[in-house]
Curated annotation (Swiss-Prot):
Residues 140-181 are annotated as: Disordered. InterPro entries: eIF3_g, eIF3g_N, eIF3G_RRM, Nucleotide-bd_a/b_plait_sf, RBD_domain_sf, RRM_dom. Signal peptide: none annotated. One of its GO terms (biological process) is formation of cytoplasmic translation initiation complex. Keywords: Cytoplasm, Initiation factor, Phosphoprotein, Protein biosynthesis, RNA-binding. Residues 141-154 have a biased composition (Gly residues). Component of the eukaryotic translation initiation factor 3 (eIF-3) complex. The gene is TIF35. This is Eukaryotic translation initiation factor 3 subunit G. Pfam families: eIF3g, RRM_1. It comes from Kluyveromyces lactis (strain ATCC 8585 / CBS 2359 / DSM 70799 / NBRC 1267 / NRRL Y-1140 / WM37) (Yeast).
Length: 269
């Protein structure tokens, strides 16, 4: 078998090079033609940075090539320093926004549990006023006397639903509240098993404001998600918007399917 010729390099008119080489594989000689174009990339850095790169290394890195060596150098997190003339004002605005958000989260209605004051609750006429006691607390929570909690003052435990002043879950008020929740609740299927309530709130539902309730259906035996989640929004309008945007959307390598938790009645034309 003849010897392999030396590689040839041909300069092209467009600035590229054609490299012709030969190789022997499985007893056969092959000709390999490669077209190579050299590109020079110029990096613009600060003058002082360029000077520091030329400093001579010492100690364990004496005589080493430029650049950090992972065996002797530990790289830290890269931080961006934003020097703005009005940085104090920006920090004050961020602090005010954070304080306002924390205040909104603290406010909770005692009637429906919404993020508003009890006196402004839109459901107070439907759900009724909470019974008042001498301490001004709900007897179901434990602010009343023993007769309100135990029924006879004997000290026996009485479930909250059977205590004095508690509302019957089968009453019209509870049914109305349940229907209102269903009207603004959507059902998500084909949800990734790794997505729990916090992941859904943080990475999927954040554009829709505060989410009152997220529930992921899990297998009671294994504790793993069944790929189904129920999401309750603040209003029915927001729920309708979320339904439109989440239907067919990709999330964690799965295509979501969104529908109402309770089918809507068809409007008569």
């Amino acid at each position: 078998m003849s010897a392999i010729p030396e590689p040839r390099i041909i300069e092209n008119d467009d600035g590229s090079k054609t490299v012709i080489s030969f190789k022997i594989q499985d007893g056969k000689k092959y000709k390999v033609t490669q077209k190579v174009k050299e590109i020079t990339v110029t990096e613009k850095v600060n003058k002082n940075i360029a000077l520091r790169r030329n400093w001579k290394k010492y100690g364990a890195d004496k005589g080493a090539a430029p650049g950090p060596d992972i065996s002797t150098t530990q790289l830290g997190e890269e931080l961006e320093l934003d020097l703005s003339p009005n940085w104090k004002e920006m920090e004050e605005e961020k602090a005010k926004e954070k304080a306002a958000n924390s205040t909104q989260k603290v406010i909770t209605c005692r009637i429906c549990g919404g993020a508003h004051f009890t006196m402004h609750c839109p459901y107070k006429d439907t759900l009724g006023k909470k019974p008042t006691t001498s301490a001004g607390l709900d007897p179901a929570i434990g602010g009343g006397d023993m007769s309100a909690q135990g029924g006879s003052g004997s000290g026996r435990y009485v479930p909250p639903s059977l205590r004095a002043g508690a509302r019957d879950p089968s009453s019209n008020a509870y049914q109305d509240q349940r229907e209102r929740d269903d009207a603004k609740t959507i059902r998500l299927t084909q949800v990734n098993e790794l997505a729990d309530e916090e992941v859904l709130k943080r990475e999927l539902l954040f554009p829709f404001g505060e989410i009152p309730r997220v529930f992921v259906v899990k297998n009671p035996e294994t504790g793993r998600s069944r790929g189904v989640a129920y999401v309750t929004f603040q209003t029915e309008e927001i729920a309708a918007q979320a339904l439109k945007l989440l239907e067919g959307r990709g999330f964690m390598n799965f295509m979501l399917h969104a529908e109402w938790s309770k089918p809507k009645p068809k409007k008569e034309e």
